[in-house]
Amino acid sequence: MSKKVSASYIIIIGLMLFALFFGAGNLIFPPMLGQLAGKNVWVANAGFLVTGVGLPLLAITAFVFSGKQNLQSLASRVHPVFGIVFTTILYLAIGPFFAIPRSGNVSFEIGVKPFLSNDASPVSLIIFTILFFALACLLSLNPSKIIDIVGKFLTPIKLTFIGLLVAVALIRPIGTIQAPSKGYTSQAFFKGFQEGYLTLDALVAFVFGIIIVNALKEQGASTKKQLIVVCAKAAAIAAVLLAVMYTALSYMGASSVEELGILENGAEVLAKVSSYYFGSYGSILLGLMITVACLTTSVGLITACSSFFHELFPNISYKKIAVVLSVFSTLVANIGLTQLIKVSMPVLLTMYPIAISLIFLTFLHSVFKGKTEVYQGSLLFAFIISLFDGLKAAGIKIEVVNRIFTQILPMYNIGLGWLIPAIAGGICGYILSIFRTKTS
């Protein structure tokens, strides 16, 4: 029998969602957005909140709504092979390709680089990442409550310090907001919309959804309706907190340009703003907190990805996979944070439209009676367009295709050219399913 989930526990779940999404790695994007957007910071931030806050929480709700046990079973609604391929690519993105290396980069940029001389050699990054990921690997191979205790203890301190930092920045801004940089002078909302992809949160949300469902079931929530309602309420709490923090961080970045100039990445912005307000002690405290927070994130991601790939390839041991992921992440991290962000954008521009389409089709599943053709048509059309978006972002421009897409696809120039084709593909798929039913 289903039990009522208390309001206090819903708040706890909401705070847990906030803590899960407001990771150390994601702190770097709003300040950089603010720096580049300048006087258009509020418009750009609104776009960022859509994909950096709204979409991830919508993804979690969609996962709960689907009633599935994991992402692979949900994605298999498109096709079993797609389920495996999409889930594998997603775990690679939130694992050794981007998210795990990024955690090491952010730790270095905030916890180590500010204390090095300007002419420090790249060897310092190599040494740091080897030590960082060796420790992360060791902890993932030997599961211990220590990492959970440190995480639980550190999270409130980290949030308090970041909250204090942005509060001071709001009360006593470093300087006045400057003119927007190139790329944010027009269509700043859609630029911010795409920048929200960099958080990877809409992809990670499918994994977090499993955690939320299990937590709610332990509290006695068993019916699908109850799970959805409770999840939606918890998501709303997390959304408000995330929106407030991201907006404050964006403003902090925007107001820092007059004094600090345009910096290389968001980690550098955080480090220099912290040093500006709190001196060297503030920089040391921020560096320690971010480094430990990123370490716990890395351990969690290595563990989750290793478990997934071990299930996919049971003949390869969990420990071997964890070691390979750690070594690979070390290599990737040494291209540097700024370059890693640049490399990740083309991939995310290709992946996100597919993920967004899957989210909305999940909510509409009963409307089109779960017909496979609808999923396949919508995601195929979205993928074709998003693939060219990704290629364009990577500097591979096929002028003929870009010219045709610009002429025939609404919103193609702002990165949303896939939207109408995704809808059209779903409609075509539905018509095809009716035709197949009649001819069978």
UniProtKB/Swiss-Prot annotation:
One of its Pfam families is: Branch_AA_trans
Q: Membrane-spanning residues where?
A: 9-29, 46-66, 80-100, 121-141, 149-169, 196-216, 227-247, 284-304, 321-341, 348-368, 378-398, 414-434
Any single GO molecular-function term of the entry would be: L-isoleucine transmembrane transporter activity
- What GO terms in the biological process aspect are recorded for it? isoleucine transport; L-leucine transport; valine transport
| This protein's UniProt keywords | Amino-acid transport, Cell membrane, Membrane, Transmembrane, Transmembrane helix, Transport
What cystine linkages occur within this chain?
A: none
Main location group: membrane
Identify its membrane topology class.
Multi-pass membrane protein
* Subcellular compartments: Cell membrane
Superkingdom of this protein's organism: Bacteria
Question: What cellular component terms from Gene Ontology apply here?
Answer: plasma membrane
Q: Which PANTHER family match?
A: BRANCHED-CHAIN AMINO ACID PERMEASE BRNQ, BRANCHED-CHAIN AMINO ACID TRANSPORT SYSTEM 2 CARRIER PROTEIN
Function field: Branched-chain amino acid transport system which is involved in the uptake of isoleucine and valine. Probably does not transport leucine. Together with BcaP and BraB, plays an important role in the activation of CodY, a branched-chain amino acid-responsive transcriptional regulator that controls the expression of several dozen transcription units in B.subtilis.
Q: Which family does it belong to?
A: Belongs to the branched chain amino acid transporter family.
Under the heading NCBIfam families, the entry gives: livcs (TIGR00796)
What is the name attached to this protein's record? Branched-chain amino acid permease BrnQ
Q: Which organism is it from?
A: Bacillus subtilis (strain 168)
Q: Which classification does the entry list for the species?
A: Bacteria, Bacillati, Bacillota, Bacilli, Bacillales
